[in-house]
Amino acid sequence: ALTLAGFAPAFSTESYPSLAKQLEAFGSGIEITLLAAIPAGSGLGTSSILASTVLGAINDFCGLAWDKNDICSYTLVLEQLLTTGGGWQDQYGGVFSGIKLLQSEAGFEQHPLVRWLPDQLFIHPDYRDCHLLYYTGITRTAKSILAEIVSSMFLNSGPHLSLLPEMKAHAMDMSEAILRSNFDSFGRLVGKTWIQNQALDCGTNPPAVAAIIEKIKDYTLGYKLPGAGGGGYLYMVAKDPQAAGQIRRILTEQAPNPRARFVEMTLSDKGLQVSRS
């Protein structure tokens, strides 16, 4: 992150004989402390969002004048430099507020277009309690999964390549359901996403996860593991508030392991924030 901010010769517009001289010209040193209260392998895009947060803080402190699009682009570069791979969807999801449809064009340089969608399905009293997030206590990091999927794409794997236009059309269907405030359609499309995830990666739904889903699937319109799958959090769309109560009771009484628990989720209306004290 500091390299991308110019604290390395390859990324600096000015030349310095040493880092000490550069910091002297800058006027101070920099100490960075990180805290992420989310477990590794959560599937919530935490590594990308944390990287964006660090870049956003450095941007503010150093007066680099990056906007949110710049921060998201530099996050992609940072993750490539760290060899973690990944795309841009996680940081755009976290840095920008609310519900969004993200669209990009083909090409090496990606400049996603952000279109905001209404939040009615997530905040209206009829639907708010139907969105459930459950930590499974099972972890699986995304790096190796991403490498396998990208490799399959480059090797022209037919099953993988045929999924791409389906996933694009599915995103547009989901956007339309949200625009129309069609809760039933939204929930079932979440379930379709889960089916597509499993077709993309056979390790998405291991037996331990399948056992959790089996207990609650009859009370849901749809469910999926966010991110690469295989562990982390389980997002569920209950059929109605009463069904949501049943899901909470079942998974609380029959927790698969001591780490498993429900966590409260709300929609961010601010996105990335940087404050000074």
What are the functions of these language-model segments?
Residues L2-A25, L35, C62-L64, K68, ...:
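C-terminal nucleotide
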Residues A40-L44, A199:
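A generic structural signal for short coil/turn motifs at secondary-structure boundaries
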Residues S28-A40:
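Glycine/charged-rich beta-loop-alpha catalytic/anionic-binding loops adjacent to active sites
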Residues G43-L64:
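DPxDG-like acidic metal-binding loop motif
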Residues G232:
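Conserved glycine-rich beta-strand-loop-beta hairpin in the small C-terminal domain of fold type I
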Residues L44-T46, Y223-A228:
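Short glycine/threonine-rich catalytic loop with a Thr-x-Gly-x-Asp
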